[in-house]
Structures are given as C-alpha cells and as structure tokens.
C-alpha cells in the first residue's frame, strides 16, 4: 500500500548530507503543474546561510523515513529561481483556497499530501480539515496519522495561480465548464477579489458561460467585476445576458456609465432592456423576460416543437409553449411533455391548457408569487393591461431570486466554502 506523507513533515526541518551532517533547512517542495492528475515533485528549496538553493529530486533521499538527505556530490550554489509552470507547495498552496471541482466548493489546504508513485514523488491530495491546521500552528505531533477519508484527491483539485510569479498558468476553462453557472458564481462570491478575477478570466474564454455566471452573481460582485471593464466590454457582456437580468444590472450601474452602456447594446437587446427599464423593478414588468416561445393558433404539434428547437429562449422559459391568437393574446399553453406525446399533425392548441391565468406588468412581486403558488406554475404570462397582449413571462427562479434574502445560500448552509 502506498504510504502518504504530510508536506509539513519536511518544512523547516534540517537536511543532511550522506555523512549525517546538517547542511541546511528545507524551505519548500517544488511541483510542476501540467496535464498530470498528480503533479510531479521536481525538487526542494533548501536554505543555507540565508541563501535559497534548488535541489532536484534525483539528489534527494530519505523521504520515506520522514526526513530529507542530500545524496549528490556537490550543491548548485545558484539562487533558486522558479521556472514557468512550477509551484512551491508551501508558499503557493498551503493555507490557501483551492477549488474542489467535484463538489464545486472552495477548500482550504491545511495540509498537502505527497506520495511515491512508481518511483516518482507526486502531490496526491489535500487535507482541508482542522487537525492538520492545529498540528502546523502548534508544532506538535497531533494527528500525524493520515486520515484517508479526509483527503481530497488532487486530481479533483484546481489551485489558484494568479499570485504565482511567472507561472504562465490559468485555471483551465474546460474544468470549470463542467460546473453549473450557479456553482461557479458561488465560488466567485466566496473567493477573494483576486481569486474571483481568476475564475472570471477563465470562464471568459466562453462568452456564453461568462454571461451565465454573471447572471448568477449577486449585485455587489457584478458591479465589482464590471468596474475594470470599458463601457464597450460591459455592453458586450450584457448583450449576452437575458434582457431582464441585463436590465436589473444596468439599473445598478453608476449613472455616469449607464446611458453609454445601454446605447452600446445591439438594437434588439437595447429595445428590450429599455422596455423593461420602464417598469418598477419590484413588479411583474420588472421581473419578466420578454423572450418566450409562442406559436399561432393554426400551428401543429410538429411546428410547436420546431419552435422550441430553434428558440434562443433560456431554459426556464422554454418549458412552456404559448398559443397566441391573431391579436397576440394567449389562448392556450402547453408544457413539453403533452407535445412530445401527441401526434405531429395534431394542432398544438388541442393539447394545450386553455384555462389560463396571467398577471399584469404593474403587479407587485408578492401578488405575482401568490398567483404562481395558487395555480402551481413555474412560468406565468404577463399581459399588457390595455390590450391583453402577451409581453413576457415571469419564471419561478427569477421570482425566488428576488424574494429570498441576499446571502440565502450561506444562510441555508449552501456556502461554496468547505471547512
């Protein structure tokens, strides 16, 4: 069975030569980040008379016995300088936030675990528990025994590297993309500003994902990360957000930037956002998304399903297809299941619910919530009060986001930080 060792076992401990004489003190271990699930350890930084030197792993022995010996003939006396892609395990990882990609949480690296795998030493895991923290702080042998259940496999870990000089690394976008945008937003909100910037920079490689993450951020963090962007860049980001979310954010931007950003939006998005901004933010009009899936009364089931497939409407609004008459008034609504079960040639209206309820844009959100609850709906149509024309939908997720208090995820134990 592979023996796992604590990084702290070696830190600030003596390193001896082959004669057993002390030659210096271990400052850190150096690992190389790349495509390896477990980064290989390439050497150690040792301090001799105030000078930090690098010793490659091929000249180091004794690790299995919990000590470090120099097994070379002579030391390279040049000062240590890290190379691109190298991490110092203690300086860059220990006591810092890391991303647990499996759980979508931040963890604190209270201990780094290393092991010899097929003749090579590698970083195999992280212990985020309190026991290793107290062991390091108090300098005791408390809990030297490895608690395998507490160790997080380094293969599921992504470190922050923005603080690492000349690392030339960034958080891999493809790894973050496996998380839900809400999980990524939670990570950003719980991280430091610098760590959050690193995450935003990584997801920025996928503009749609970046917009999805921004929509999930709280207002404080949205404004924080827009601050350093030009008005044009801010408008590009908002143009990819849902119109209702873009309108909410524009409402919060400093007044001296608001108009410029609004006028920089594409014409179609700008028109929708301006319309939404005409409503009070706490009303159905302010909450609604003007984009929804609709078909005329003459549409068949096949045409309704084609409308869903070709639509750019977000997932929440995509769950319901509305049938509108020639005046744009809803006369039926169907979720996807009845449409999928029906024959392609059937009229969409024949499988739709025709007893519909609705709200008007001036209704406050509590009245909207009661209506949605009473009729057990997840998507509620908003009709123009004067003509009865359908102008948007309120979805249950947007409504909950407004009704629940700020920081509700932390209040209900859904924090993105593991302790």
Task: Locate the predicted segments by residue.
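Short, surface-exposed loop/turn motifs at beta-strand boundaries within globular domains
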Residues: 8, 22, 37-39, 180-181
């Amino acid at each position: 069975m592979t023996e796992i060792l604590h990084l702290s076992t070696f830190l600030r401990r003596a390193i001896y030569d082959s004669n057993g004489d002390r030659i210096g003190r271990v400052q850190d271990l150096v690992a190389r980040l790349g495509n390896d699930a477990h980064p290989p350890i390439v050497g150690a930084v040792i301090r001799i008379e105030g000078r930090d030197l690098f010793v490659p792993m091929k000249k180091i022995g004794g690790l299995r016995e919990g000590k470090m010996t120099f097994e070379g003939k002579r030391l390279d006396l040049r000062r240590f300088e890290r190379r691109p892609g190298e991490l110092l395990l203690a300086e860059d990882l220990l006591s810092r936030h890391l991303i647990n990609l499996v759980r979508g949480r931040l963890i604190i690296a209270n201990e780094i675990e290393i092991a010899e795998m097929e003749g090579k030493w590698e970083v195999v895991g992280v212990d985020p528990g309190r026991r290793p923290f107290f062991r390091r702080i108090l300098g005791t042998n408390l809990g030297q025994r490895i608690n395998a259940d507490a160790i997080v496999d380094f293969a599921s870990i992504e470190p922050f590297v923005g603080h690492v000089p000349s690392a030339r690394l960034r958080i891999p976008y493809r790894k973050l993309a496996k998380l839900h945008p809400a999980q990524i937003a939670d990570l950003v909100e719980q991280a430091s500003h610098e760590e959050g910037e690193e995450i935003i920079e990584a997801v920025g490689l996928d503009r749609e994902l970046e917009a999805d993450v921004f929509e999930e951020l709280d207002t404080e963090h949205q404004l924080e990360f827009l601050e350093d962007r030009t008005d044009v860049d801010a408008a590009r980001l908002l143009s990819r957000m849902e119109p209702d979310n873009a309108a909410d954010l524009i409402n919060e931007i400093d007044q001296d930037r608001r108009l410029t950003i609004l006028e920089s939006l594409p014409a179609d998005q700008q028109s929708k956002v301006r319309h939404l901004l005409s409503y009070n933010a706490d009303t159905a009009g302010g909450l609604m998304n003007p984009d929804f899936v609709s078909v005329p009364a003459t549409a068949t089931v096949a045409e309704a399903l084609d409308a869903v497939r070709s639509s750019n409407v977000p997932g929440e609004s995509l769950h319901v297809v509305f049938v509108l008459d020639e005046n744009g008034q809803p006369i039926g609504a169907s979720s996807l299941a009845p449409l999928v079960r029906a024959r392609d040639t059937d009229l969409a209206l024949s499988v739709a619910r025709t007893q519909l309820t609705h709200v008007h844009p001036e209704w406050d959100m509590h009245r909207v919530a009661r209506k949605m609850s009473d009729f057990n709906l997840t998507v509620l149509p908003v009709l123009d009060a004067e003509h009865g024309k359908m102008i948007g939908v309120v979805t249950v997720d947007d409504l909950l986001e407004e009704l629940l208090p700020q920081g509700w995820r932390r209040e209900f134990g859904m924090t993105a930080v593991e302790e």
